């Protein structure tokens, strides 16, 4: 019997999370990014200011020394299996599940250049 080669999951950057030191700095940076890239009005939440859907400018203690990168994939569980085969570990406490019980969000236990990474659908 021949083994079928598993297809490599596809990824795309869903958004970039950028850490700042204060809500004021977060808002200022989100306004600049939004104006520069014509991303529309800044959307403020209790922990971040969003410049469109591309930049989540965090105003509180957030993961990663500099922030995080959200990687979107069609099947988070398949992507996890693919990465686990390469030795990547995941923060089990960060797992979120969809209405069917499948994992739809998880942080990697990996920080590169000050950025943490998470998978999402």
Located regions from the model:
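N-terminal beta-strand motif that seeds the catalytic metal site of vicinal oxygen chelate
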Residues: 1-28, 64-71
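Amphipathic alpha-helical segments
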Residues: 23-37, 79-87
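Mid-chain, well-packed structural core segment of small domains
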Residues: 65-95
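Non-catalytic surface loops within mature trypsin-like serine protease
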Residues: 22, 73-75, 110-112
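Short beta-strand micro-motifs in enzyme catalytic cores
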Residues: 46-48, 67, 102-106
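Vicinal oxygen chelate
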Residues: 2-9, 35-42, 53-59, 84-121
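Residues in flexible loops and secondary-structure boundaries
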Residues: 21, 26, 65, 79-81, ...
């Amino acid at each position: 019997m021949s083994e079928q080669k598993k297809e490599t999951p596809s990824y795309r950057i869903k958004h970039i999370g950028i850490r700042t030191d204060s809500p004021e700095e977060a808002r200022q940076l989100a306004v600049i990014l939004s104006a520069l890239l014509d991303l529309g009005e800044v959307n403020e939440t209790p922990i971040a200011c969003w410049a469109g859907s591309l930049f989540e400018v965090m105003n509180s203690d957030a993961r990663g020394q500099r922030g995080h990168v959200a990687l979107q994939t069609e099947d988070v569980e398949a992507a996890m299996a693919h990465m686990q085969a390469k030795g990547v570990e995941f923060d089990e406490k960060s797992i979120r599940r969809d209405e069917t019980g499948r994992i739809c969000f998880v942080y990697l236990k990996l920080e590169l250049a000050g950025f943490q990474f998470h998978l999402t659908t």
